[in-house]
Swiss-Prot record:
Entry-linked CDD domains: DSP_DUSP1, DSP_MapKP
Modification comment: Phosphorylated by MAPK1/ERK2 at Thr-168 and at one or more serine residues in a progesterone-dependent manner. Phosphorylation reduces its rate of degradation but does not seem to affect phosphatase activity.
Subcellular location, principal: nucleus
Xref: PANTHER family: DUAL SPECIFICITY PROTEIN PHOSPHATASE, DUAL SPECIFICITY PROTEIN PHOSPHATASE 1
Gene3D superfamilies: Protein tyrosine phosphatase superfamily, Rhodanese-like domain
Domain Tyrosine-protein phosphatase: 175-316
Listed name of the protein: Dual specificity protein phosphatase 1-B
Record PTM Phosphothreonine, positions in chain: 168
Function: Dual specificity phosphatase that dephosphorylates MAP kinase MAPK1/ERK2 on both 'Thr-188' and 'Tyr-190', regulating its activity during the meiotic cell cycle.
Catalytic activity entry: O-phospho-L-seryl-[protein] + H2O = L-seryl-[protein] + phosphate; O-phospho-L-threonyl-[protein] + H2O = L-threonyl-[protein] + phosphate; O-phospho-L-tyrosyl-[protein] + H2O = L-tyrosyl-[protein] + phosphate
Amino acid sequence: MVNMEICAMDCCVFKGLLAERAHKCLILDCRSFFAFSSSSIIGSSNVRLSTIVKRRAKGSMGLEHIIPNEEQRGRLVAGMYEAVVLLDERTSELDMLRKDSTMMLAVNALSRDPRGSRIYFLKGGYETFSSQCPEFCNKNSPPVALSLPLSPNNVPGSADSNCTPCGTPLYDQGGPVEILPFLYLGSAYHASRKDMLEALGITALINVSANCPNHFEGHFQYKSIPVEDSHKADISSWFNEAIDFIDSIKTCGGRVFVHCQAGISRSATICLAYLMRTNRVKLDEAFEFVKQRRSIISPNFSFMGQLLQFESQVLAPSCSAEAGSPTISVLDRGTSTTTVFNFPVSIPVHSGANSLSYLQNPITTSPSC
């Protein structure tokens, strides 16, 4: 139940607020991660509430779920924001919202403890505001892959002079694709094209293979993840390490290119794990996001199972251990440890390939890429 009056804010009033006192305004976008990533209001933050979190919260959501950014949450608690503005796609009346909608849950959480900030919802949502005030919005259309000559013949820095455009595999055509402004995905061939990497501003590469060479170690920073594209491979044990590496390059203002042999299975899996962890989204949403940028991605069935298990960790609410929560042993590259998962249906993160056969996945995958 909302404990204080939530006022509607017209787009013209919101425009004036952004123009004059943007630093005193916290903008919370309650649309999906996919919609937010495609286009959003400059300076806004995305509110992402998983189905698991919604179900367990039973309508009582904590601020840590609504505002995961600690700095923003701290500023709100300290009363440093004059206004908190929430928006979704097109809502014009708050009464039109379902009680379990992301925006209504956010409104309820904020209204219980506003800390001196007035709470508003943007009338007409992003759809209306972006059409009336496009200058205050970022529009990030799915990027087109870099177009450079496919033949590496006579290209300075090329590591392979035996390929020709004739018969070039689909996964080697075009160039690396942008997943995020600092994260790119492609194949081993793309990783051998120094001209492509430099044109994109790549500063580091993650090589997700056991046999693809690191061609330019004196020029780029490399991280190797020696995983085979097989149903027995444990790629999930590398997720956190890969995510930390990407974040470290991002923090330094660099860009990371993730590749395997074809840029279809192993490297796509790492990119999916990164999106799921850092943006707190489900696998199917991350998969759709990446597939729109590189349509041929298809992690093998075992990798999809490991991503589903990773999803259960990423989206599980962080709370104290509860009775009935299973204690399970996981194998971390040969080291046996015990982990307690708080969500009752958690399953081993590093199960062998044989134990993944029961997992039902709606996304079509290929056996190997």
